[in-house]
Regions:
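Conserved beta-strand scaffold positions in the cores of enzyme catalytic domains, especially
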Residues: 1, 143-145
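Short, glycine/charged-enriched secondary-structure capping and boundary segments
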Residues: 11-14, 98-101, 131-135, 160
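Short glycine-/polar-rich loops that comprise or flank the Walker A/P-loop
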Residues: 112-114, 139-142
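Short regulatory helix/loop adjacent to the ATP-binding pocket of P-loop NTPases
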Residues: 123-141, 159
Length: 174
């Protein structure tokens, strides 16, 4: 999640929540569509699969603060507790908008049905965000530093079809 504004953050958070819900619970995906009223005109149904679709562009989010509020309202009404993991969380400190840390902290504090995982590659910024008394997220999370995963522990499974699909592999018959 390498975002540069609240609008991008809100868009990606909403998209990821929706795409995670869709295969798991049609009822909750529909509730999400009904809850996010500020961009509701961009939700629809795929006539072929008869599944809801999430077709929103970044420019469609005119008031990201309002849309973010709707997303957190949805999370608070979800039928099961949610785990929200945000990678590269330190990016919010670089947004041009003011007080984003305080805005998110307020939403997260009020969110009784969700648990949050904050991850970031810039350790000093993460440390400052959660350990400085002058910052909104002060003492709001347990800090855990993860070391790099050894290369031999990582396995990749990539099919030839997927490589062809992305253009990374060309097959020619001569």
């Amino acid at each position: 999640l390498h975002t540069s504004s609240l609008r991008e953050f809100t868009y990606l958070l909403g998209r990821e929540i929706y795409e995670t819900l869709l295969p798991r619970s049609r009822k909750m995906a529909t509730l999400f569509i009904q809850t996010i009223k500020s961009i509701s005109g961009k939700f629809g149904f795929d006539p072929i699969t008869n599944l809801p679709t999430f077709n929103v562009e970044l420019g469609d989010i005119e008031r990201p603060e309002y849309t973010l509020d709707e997303i957190f309202q949805y999370l608070s009404h979800a039928d099961k507790p949610c785990i929200v993991a945000i990678d590269e969380f330190q990016q919010i400190a670089k947004y041009p908008e003011k007080n984003i840390e305080a805005l998110l902290r307020t939403h997260i504090q009020r969110s009784e049905n969700s648990h949050f995982i904050f991850a970031g590659s810039e350790r000093h910024m993460m440390q400052e965000m959660f350990a400085s008394a002058a910052r909104p997220f002060y003492h709001s999370a347990d800090m855990l530093e993860l070391k790099a995963i050894p290369a031999e522990m990582i396995q990749f499974k990539v099919s030839a079809a997927k490589l062809q699909e992305t253009g990374a592999l060309e097959v020619s018959v001569e």
